[in-house]
């Protein structure tokens, strides 16, 4: 049983992508491999079959391994709910919310959960492919580290270091990171991968030769800059658009400070008939066919921000002119009369007025609802599947006209009497081809195409594995993974 870890010189260096690529590449070799990330800080999450919660990137990596997502793949998940605090999720379950100082002390306990999960995976799979977090050279975070070299030292595993050349300074990033590690940590780094290179590789070769001579470590390969790869982002919002045709539906997503699960909108971003725009602070909401209020980790605080930015008035104007409006999860809660947080789960205890567009109110409760679900969309009776991640319980007459009839007998969400507003707790609403097409037709795109988003994701995973074959030193990678060429 082998554990191999990918660490990066910075955030967004390409760790998640490389782990996904290596997982599918190993699977092609006939090797049973499992993804693992000790600690993830992200507001994009997925629900496992047993009702736990892990980072979205690990769910994609599980797909690359053709495995069902499991809480052991990401034993510690931190979901920021303020500038200094986060909800701490261990083995898929919310433990508590902590500020940074309290969590630093808690990491001793968190490390026990990390090592227990890793050991279970190590016993079950020949290769555990691990993703680090941020950079291993953050001096202020090195004490008690459980996400990078602290974990690698604890389980005695080799490390690949990846850096993004597109942002500039790649040699400084690699050499500087290495210099800031301890001698034993430096010895763990078995090679470098340079990511997002564009241009003539021959012009880069002198730098690669210098890097190998300077560090005594091999460059395992140079991955090209890929412009049309569309796997879910771990945390940053991906604003890239697929090429659109002439007839498009204009969709606006207001970006609030604690937006969560914005990967909900990836299928729309890729849809050839949708012009998706994320609107940030200081930007007015332009005319659109559809506005979507996304999920939020701090609904009341984000409601306040929405009003401060004048977006509540823009939404009211949008509805007066006949536009359509969707609220997903936290967005659903914002559309009601009130949001109550008596326990202070998302900040100071109290209540906030919602937008009052649907006749219900929400109370935030300590027990989070986590489940994968399927059912029938009220629009066109289209099949729909997705997942719930929410602490709120919503009650009121507005729910008498549900958005979704779930297969387990429950109703979800609401559709307004005039048919302009749809609210749902379901994430992943647009991933199903039939449900996505039905929603786009409802929003005004009469000839909406059905796009197989799952097939697009699978295609991209295969492309990543191709890049490993074409651009990395696969023989050295096999050695690091402890597998033979004919495995």
UniProtKB/Swiss-Prot annotation:
Belongs to the CobB/CobQ family. CobQ subfamily. The keyword Mitochondrion does not apply. It comes from Pseudomonas entomophila (strain L48). Keywords: Cobalamin biosynthesis, Glutamine amidotransferase. GO terms for molecular function: ABC-type vitamin B12 transporter activity; catalytic activity. NCBIfam families: cobQ, PRK00784.1. GO terms for biological process: cobalamin biosynthetic process. Gene3D superfamilies: 3.40.50.880, P-loop containing nucleotide triphosphate hydrolases (3.40.50.300). Residues 248-435 form the GATase cobBQ-type domain. InterPro entries: Class_I_gatase-like, CobQ/CobB/MinD/ParA_Nub-bd_dom, CobQ_GATase1, CobQ_N, CobQ_synth, GATase_3, P-loop_NTPase. Coiled coil: none annotated. PANTHER family: COBYRIC ACID SYNTHASE, DETHIOBIOTIN SYNTHETASE. This is Cobyric acid synthase. The active site is at residues 329, 427. Pathway: Cofactor biosynthesis; adenosylcobalamin biosynthesis. Catalyzes amidations at positions B, D, E, and G on adenosylcobyrinic A,C-diamide. NH(2) groups are provided by glutamine, and one molecule of ATP is hydrogenolyzed for each amidation.
